[in-house]
């Protein structure tokens, strides 16, 4: 898991998300507390439970983006799910325990990757031997093998096509046992392909690959041979229990509004099912039981129609840290277009650059784009930073279409260029309502 300090986590998030200081600080402290807990003695460590977070803010202000970036920083088992995908236990659909099962599957892949790194040197040597055997044959002399080994290391044989027996990962048995009417609810049973594969010593298929292509496949295979499945699973389950993070998006969509009448199976029932999961329970998975006591839950929602107080009181109590994210202003849009590492301006420059069209954004052009986005958000519907996608796409619509014919040209995106492509639409509220 990560040992970054809260300040380092916030500065890393600042590269991609503008503003929202409170939300960044809250997730940074929560992430650092995972590390702090690991430093405690065993008896105290079990008593320290994570403080779950509820992020409240309009759409398009960075709630989901914070979760995506956090996943890369955490270096811990992380899963992002939409609360709307789940239904109450007993109804057709996925129940909330599937969240933990999916988290375990993610952790196993992640743990296997880390453990592969530890045995990479041995796996590389074994892969090299298999490639040499395929090139020189099984009964080649030592001197011949050494000659080929030198050529292999020099990269002279990279384009040579060889035939290899590769482990067949396709599953003719149709995968998991499915319960009729409940997709994804495989009850933690073992994959049939795994069962039969292990019983029969694993199936292989003969493939033609170049030497360069074969290396990745063979190193992965040889590393897996050196790894013990039981050790991988045990380490993954422990990582989930101690460091797991679940990001629950769209939590407001499972609120039963205070003025609503009648039952709704996908709303209050889902909240009730989430209670034990967040509080701490044991979930059965195909790799073994998982305790959820120390998994960190971060919930987020726009709460346009429902209010946070419409959540079940017990669920509110289990999400003690509340963070409000503010709506974005015109100044924020300017910063989003200029300061972030993945700015839309850079993306369009790179995309059209592939057609040999040079795109240059001027300061007044960026301000014009930000002003139009903020204006349409204010007059039509506030969808936050996502409005920039729409505005930019409309501005570059003609340019993107004609780019192959204008190779070698330079396009200056200034205020007149933006006004020419968008001006009329922004003046007419009726038009912008449907087009922007």
Swiss-Prot record:
GO BP: any one term: protein unfolding
Subcellular localization(s) per the UniProt record: Cytoplasm
One protein family per Pfam: AAA_2
GO CC list: HslUV protease complex
Keywords recorded for this protein, A-Z: ATP-binding, Chaperone, Cytoplasm, Nucleotide-binding, Stress response
Main subcellular location: cytoplasm
Binding site for ATP: 18, 60-65, 249, 314, 386
Molecular function per GO: ATP binding; ATP hydrolysis activity; peptidase activity; proteasome-activating activity
InterPro entries xref list: AAA+_ATPase, ATP-dep_Clp_protease_ClpX, ATPase_AAA_core, Clp_ATPase_C, HslU, P-loop_NTPase
Highest taxon, organism lineage: Bacteria
Record text on subunit structure and interactions: A double ring-shaped homohexamer of HslV is capped on each side by a ring-shaped HslU homohexamer. The assembly of the HslU/HslV complex is dependent on binding of ATP.
Function: ATPase subunit of a proteasome-like degradation complex; this subunit has chaperone activity. The binding of ATP and its subsequent hydrolysis by HslU are essential for unfolding of protein substrates subsequently hydrolyzed by HslV. HslU recognizes the N-terminal part of its protein substrates and unfolds these before they are guided to HslV for hydrolysis.
Family: Belongs to the ClpX chaperone family. HslU subfamily.
Name the record gives this protein: ATP-dependent protease ATPase subunit HslU
Origin species: Ruegeria sp. (strain TM1040)
């Amino acid at each position: 898991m990560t040992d970054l300090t809260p300040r380092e986590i916030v500065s890393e998030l600042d590269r991609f998300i503008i503003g929202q200081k409170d939300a960044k600080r809250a997730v940074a402290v929560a992430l650092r507390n995972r590390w702090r807990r690991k430093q405690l003695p065993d008896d105290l460590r079990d008593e320290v439970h994570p403080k779950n977070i509820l992020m409240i803010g309009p759409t398009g202000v960075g709630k989901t983006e914070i979760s995506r970036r956090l996943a890369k920083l955490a270096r811990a088992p992380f899963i992002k799910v939409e609360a709307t995908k789940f239904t109450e236990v007993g109804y057709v659909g996925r129940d909330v325990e599937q969240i933990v099962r999916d988290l375990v599957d993610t952790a196993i892949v992640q743990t296997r990757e880390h453990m592969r790194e530890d045995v990479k040197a041995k796996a590389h040597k074994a892969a090299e031997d298999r490639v040499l055997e395929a090139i020189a044959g099984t009964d080649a002399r030592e001197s011949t093998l050494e000659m080929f080994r030198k050529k292999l290391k020099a990269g002279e044989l990279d384009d040579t096509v060889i035939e290899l027996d590769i482990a067949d990962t396709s599953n003719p048995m149709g995968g998991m046992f499915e319960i009729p009417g409940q997709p994804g609810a495989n009850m933690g049973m073992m994959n049939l392909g795994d069962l039969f594969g292990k019983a029969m010593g694993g199936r292989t298929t003969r493939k033609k690959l170049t030497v360069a292509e074969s290396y990745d496949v063979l190193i992965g295979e040889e590393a897996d041979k050196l790894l013990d499945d039981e050790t991988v699973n045990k380490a993954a389950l422990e990582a989930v229990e101690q460091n797991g993070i679940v990001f629950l998006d769209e939590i407001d969509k499972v609120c039963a509004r205070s003025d609503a009448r009648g039952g709704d199976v996908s709303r209050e029932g889902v909240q009730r099912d989430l209670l034990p999961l967040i509080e701490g329970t044991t979930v059965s998975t195909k790799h073994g039981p998982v305790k959820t006591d120390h998994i960190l839950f971060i919930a987020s929602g726009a709460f346009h129609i429902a209010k946070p107080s419409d959540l079940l009181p017990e669920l509110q109590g289990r999400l003690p840290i509340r963070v409000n994210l503010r709506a974005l202003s015109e100044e924020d849009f300017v910063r989003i277009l200029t300061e972030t590492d993945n700015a839309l301006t850079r993306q369009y420059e790179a995309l059209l650059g592939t057609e040999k069209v040079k795109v240059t954004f001027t300061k007044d052009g960026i301000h014009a784009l930000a002003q139009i986005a903020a204006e349409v958000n204010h007059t039509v519907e506030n969808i936050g930073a996502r409005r920039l996608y729409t505005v930019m796409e409309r501005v570059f619509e003609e340019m993107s279409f004609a780019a192959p014919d204008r190779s070698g040209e330079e396009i200056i995106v200034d205020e007149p260029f933006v006004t020419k492509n968008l001006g009329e639409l922004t003046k007419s509220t009726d038009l912008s309502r449907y087009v922007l």
